[in-house]
Protein backbone atom coordinates (compact mmCIF):
# COMPACT_ATOMS: atom_id res chain seq x y z
CA UNK A 1 0.00 0.00 0.00
CA UNK A 2 1.19 3.53 -0.74
CA UNK A 3 0.96 6.44 1.67
CA UNK A 4 1.55 10.14 1.30
CA UNK A 5 3.55 11.86 4.02
CA UNK A 6 1.22 14.48 5.45
CA UNK A 7 3.40 15.85 8.23
CA UNK A 8 6.71 15.41 10.02
CA UNK A 9 7.29 17.22 13.29
CA UNK A 10 9.96 16.93 15.98
CA UNK A 11 8.82 15.72 19.39
CA UNK A 12 12.32 15.87 20.90
CA UNK A 13 15.80 16.44 19.51
CA UNK A 14 15.85 12.87 18.15
CA UNK A 15 12.21 11.71 18.04
CA UNK A 16 9.76 12.66 15.29
CA UNK A 17 6.04 12.26 14.70
CA UNK A 18 5.37 11.11 11.13
CA UNK A 19 1.81 11.27 9.83
CA UNK A 20 0.98 9.07 6.83
CA UNK A 21 -2.19 9.05 4.75
CA UNK A 22 -2.92 5.70 3.02
CA UNK A 23 -4.14 5.91 -0.57
CA UNK A 24 -6.97 3.49 0.25
CA UNK A 25 -8.88 2.39 3.37
CA UNK A 26 -6.47 0.84 5.87
CA UNK A 27 -7.67 -1.47 8.63
CA UNK A 28 -5.68 -2.22 11.76
CA UNK A 29 -6.14 -3.11 15.40
CA UNK A 30 -4.82 -1.05 18.27
CA UNK A 31 -1.34 -2.34 19.05
CA UNK A 32 -0.36 -3.45 15.56
CA UNK A 33 2.57 -2.22 13.48
CA UNK A 34 3.52 -1.67 9.85
CA UNK A 35 6.71 -2.22 7.89
CA UNK A 36 7.86 0.87 6.02
CA UNK A 37 9.85 0.23 2.83
CA UNK A 38 13.01 2.32 2.59
CA UNK A 39 15.91 2.31 0.13
CA UNK A 40 18.07 0.29 2.54
CA UNK A 41 15.40 -2.16 3.69
CA UNK A 42 12.06 -2.49 5.43
CA UNK A 43 11.66 -1.42 9.06
CA UNK A 44 8.79 -1.99 11.53
CA UNK A 45 7.09 0.88 13.34
CA UNK A 46 4.19 0.69 15.78
CA UNK A 47 1.05 2.58 14.83
CA UNK A 48 0.41 5.28 17.43
CA UNK A 49 -2.98 6.33 16.10
CA UNK A 50 -6.35 4.90 17.05
CA UNK A 51 -8.19 2.61 14.58
CA UNK A 52 -11.21 4.93 14.76
CA UNK A 53 -9.01 7.50 13.00
CA UNK A 54 -8.00 5.13 10.24
CA UNK A 55 -7.59 7.91 7.68
CA UNK A 56 -4.12 8.57 9.05
CA UNK A 57 -1.28 6.47 10.44
CA UNK A 58 0.84 8.12 13.11
CA UNK A 59 4.38 6.83 13.73
CA UNK A 60 6.95 7.85 16.34
CA UNK A 61 10.47 7.45 14.98
CA UNK A 62 13.71 7.96 16.88
CA UNK A 63 15.23 7.42 20.30
CA UNK A 64 16.74 9.12 23.31
CA UNK A 65 20.04 9.64 21.50
CA UNK A 66 21.16 10.08 17.91
CA UNK A 67 21.65 6.87 15.93
CA UNK A 68 22.80 6.19 12.38
CA UNK A 69 19.73 4.10 11.55
CA UNK A 70 17.21 6.66 12.77
CA UNK A 71 19.11 9.45 11.03
CA UNK A 72 18.94 7.55 7.72
CA UNK A 73 15.23 6.86 8.19
CA UNK A 74 14.36 10.47 8.89
CA UNK A 75 16.56 11.80 6.09
CA UNK A 76 14.81 9.57 3.57
CA UNK A 77 11.30 10.31 4.85
CA UNK A 78 11.98 14.05 5.01
CA UNK A 79 13.30 14.00 1.44
CA UNK A 80 10.24 12.06 0.28
CA UNK A 81 7.96 14.52 2.06
CA UNK A 82 9.69 17.48 0.45
CA UNK A 83 9.47 15.92 -3.02
CA UNK A 84 5.90 14.73 -2.59
CA UNK A 85 6.92 11.09 -3.02
CA UNK A 86 4.77 8.28 -1.67
CA UNK A 87 6.11 5.63 0.70
CA UNK A 88 5.19 1.96 0.62
CA UNK A 89 3.95 0.26 3.78
CA UNK A 90 2.84 -3.27 4.59
CA UNK A 91 -0.53 -4.38 5.87
CA UNK A 92 -0.99 -4.14 9.63
CA UNK A 93 0.98 -6.83 11.44
CA UNK A 94 1.51 -8.18 14.94
CA UNK A 95 -0.51 -10.20 17.42
CA UNK A 96 -0.21 -7.99 20.51
CA UNK A 97 -3.35 -6.04 19.74
CA UNK A 98 -5.88 -4.88 22.32
CA UNK A 99 -8.18 -7.69 23.48
CA UNK A 100 -11.31 -5.58 23.56
CA UNK A 101 -13.52 -8.40 24.82
CA UNK A 102 -11.66 -8.54 28.15
CA UNK A 103 -12.95 -6.77 31.26
CA UNK A 104 -9.73 -7.18 33.24
CA UNK A 105 -7.84 -4.12 34.43
CA UNK A 106 -5.06 -3.09 32.06
CA UNK A 107 -1.39 -2.54 32.80
CA UNK A 108 0.38 -0.76 29.94
CA UNK A 109 4.17 -0.57 30.24
CA UNK A 110 6.24 1.36 27.71
CA UNK A 111 9.92 2.09 27.33
CA UNK A 112 11.00 5.01 25.14
CA UNK A 113 9.19 5.16 21.80
CA UNK A 114 7.33 2.02 22.83
CA UNK A 115 4.80 4.65 23.87
CA UNK A 116 3.59 4.72 20.26
CA UNK A 117 2.15 1.21 20.74
CA UNK A 118 0.88 2.04 24.21
CA UNK A 119 -0.83 5.23 23.07
CA UNK A 120 -2.85 3.34 20.46
CA UNK A 121 -3.92 0.76 23.05
CA UNK A 122 -4.86 3.46 25.56
CA UNK A 123 -6.81 5.66 23.16
CA UNK A 124 -8.70 2.74 21.67
CA UNK A 125 -9.60 1.43 25.13
CA UNK A 126 -11.14 4.78 26.00
CA UNK A 127 -12.82 5.16 22.61
CA UNK A 128 -14.54 1.82 23.20
CA UNK A 129 -15.75 2.89 26.62
CA UNK A 130 -13.54 0.72 28.80
CA UNK A 131 -14.30 1.54 32.43
CA UNK A 132 -11.94 -0.88 34.14
CA UNK A 133 -8.77 0.57 35.71
CA UNK A 134 -5.99 1.35 33.22
CA UNK A 135 -2.47 1.87 34.56
CA UNK A 136 0.08 3.46 32.22
CA UNK A 137 3.78 3.26 33.15
CA UNK A 138 6.27 4.98 30.86
CA UNK A 139 10.02 4.84 31.29
CA UNK A 140 12.46 7.15 29.53
CA UNK A 141 15.94 8.57 29.91
CA UNK A 142 14.76 12.01 31.05
CA UNK A 143 11.76 14.35 30.94
CA UNK A 144 12.48 15.48 27.38
CA UNK A 145 12.03 11.91 26.19
CA UNK A 146 8.60 11.67 27.81
CA UNK A 147 7.52 13.32 24.59
CA UNK A 148 3.73 13.02 25.02
CA UNK A 149 3.79 13.56 28.78
CA UNK A 150 1.35 16.49 28.76
CA UNK A 151 -1.11 14.56 26.60
CA UNK A 152 -1.04 11.61 29.00
CA UNK A 153 -1.49 13.88 32.00
CA UNK A 154 -4.58 15.35 30.34
CA UNK A 155 -5.95 11.89 29.50
CA UNK A 156 -5.56 10.80 33.12
CA UNK A 157 -7.27 13.96 34.37
CA UNK A 158 -10.18 13.48 31.98
CA UNK A 159 -10.65 9.75 32.69
CA UNK A 160 -10.97 8.64 36.30
CA UNK A 161 -10.08 5.05 35.45
CA UNK A 162 -6.66 6.02 33.99
CA UNK A 163 -3.54 6.30 36.15
CA UNK A 164 -0.35 7.57 34.52
CA UNK A 165 3.08 7.03 36.09
CA UNK A 166 6.08 8.58 34.30
CA UNK A 167 9.53 7.27 35.25
CA UNK A 168 12.89 8.75 34.26
CA UNK A 169 16.39 7.38 34.74
CA UNK A 170 17.76 10.90 35.18
CA UNK A 171 15.76 12.98 37.64
CA UNK A 172 15.59 16.65 36.71
CA UNK A 173 11.92 17.20 37.64
CA UNK A 174 11.10 14.94 40.62
CA UNK A 175 7.74 16.67 40.99
CA UNK A 176 6.68 15.32 37.60
CA UNK A 177 8.20 11.83 37.37
CA UNK A 178 9.53 9.02 39.51
CA UNK A 179 13.24 8.31 39.25
CA UNK A 180 14.54 4.85 38.42
CA UNK A 181 13.69 1.99 36.09
CA UNK A 182 10.12 1.62 34.94
CA UNK A 183 9.89 -2.12 35.70
CA UNK A 184 11.20 -1.59 39.21
CA UNK A 185 8.48 1.00 39.76
CA UNK A 186 5.81 -1.43 38.57
CA UNK A 187 7.16 -4.13 40.88
CA UNK A 188 7.13 -1.68 43.78
CA UNK A 189 3.56 -0.56 43.13
CA UNK A 190 1.94 -3.97 42.52
CA UNK A 191 2.19 -7.06 44.70
CA UNK A 192 -0.06 -9.21 42.50
CA UNK A 193 -0.68 -9.00 38.74
CA UNK A 194 -2.71 -12.17 38.34
CA UNK A 195 -5.90 -10.30 37.41
CA UNK A 196 -4.40 -7.96 34.80
CA UNK A 197 -4.07 -7.91 31.05
CA UNK A 198 -0.54 -6.61 30.50
CA UNK A 199 0.68 -4.89 27.32
CA UNK A 200 4.39 -4.26 26.86
CA UNK A 201 6.45 -2.35 24.33
CA UNK A 202 10.06 -1.21 24.51
CA UNK A 203 13.57 -2.62 24.20
CA UNK A 204 13.67 -6.41 23.90
CA UNK A 205 15.56 -6.74 27.17
CA UNK A 206 12.95 -4.72 29.03
CA UNK A 207 10.15 -6.90 27.67
CA UNK A 208 12.04 -10.09 28.53
CA UNK A 209 12.70 -8.97 32.10
CA UNK A 210 9.08 -7.86 32.49
CA UNK A 211 7.84 -11.31 31.49
CA UNK A 212 10.20 -13.00 33.94
CA UNK A 213 9.47 -10.69 36.85
CA UNK A 214 5.72 -10.40 36.38
CA UNK A 215 5.22 -14.15 35.95
CA UNK A 216 7.76 -15.42 38.50
CA UNK A 217 7.25 -12.80 41.20
CA UNK A 218 3.80 -11.25 40.73
CA UNK A 219 1.57 -14.15 39.74
CA UNK A 220 0.89 -13.24 36.11
CA UNK A 221 0.39 -16.03 33.58
CA UNK A 222 2.25 -15.84 30.24
CA UNK A 223 -1.02 -15.71 28.30
CA UNK A 224 -1.93 -12.47 30.13
CA UNK A 225 1.10 -10.69 28.64
CA UNK A 226 1.07 -9.20 25.15
CA UNK A 227 4.13 -8.00 23.24
CA UNK A 228 5.31 -8.60 19.70
CA UNK A 229 8.84 -8.85 21.08
CA UNK A 230 7.96 -12.28 22.52
CA UNK A 231 8.24 -13.72 19.00
CA UNK A 232 11.96 -12.90 19.07
CA UNK A 233 12.80 -13.87 22.66
Swiss-Prot record:
EC number, as in UniProt: 1.-.-.-
Q: Where is the FAD-binding FR-type domain?
A: 1-133
Q: Which InterPro entries does the record cross-reference, listed alphabetically?
A: FAD-bd_FR_type, FNR_nucleotide-bd, MRET, OxRdtase_FAD/NAD-bd, Riboflavin_synthase-like_b-brl
Instruction: Enumerate the Gene Ontology biological process terms.
Output: bioluminescence
Keyword Oxidoreductase assigned to the entry: answer is: yes
Instruction: Identify the enzyme class.
Output: oxidoreductase
Which UniProt keyword terms apply here?
FAD, Flavoprotein, Luminescence, Oxidoreductase
Molecular function as annotated in GO: oxidoreductase activity
Q: Among its keywords, does the record have Cell wall biogenesis/degradation?
A: no
Residues reported to bind pyridine: 111-115
| Family according to the record | Belongs to the Fre/LuxG FAD/NAD(P) flavoprotein oxidoreductase family.
Any idea what job this protein has?
Probable flavin reductase in the luminescent systems of different marine bacteria.
This protein's name: Probable flavin reductase
The gene name on file is luxG
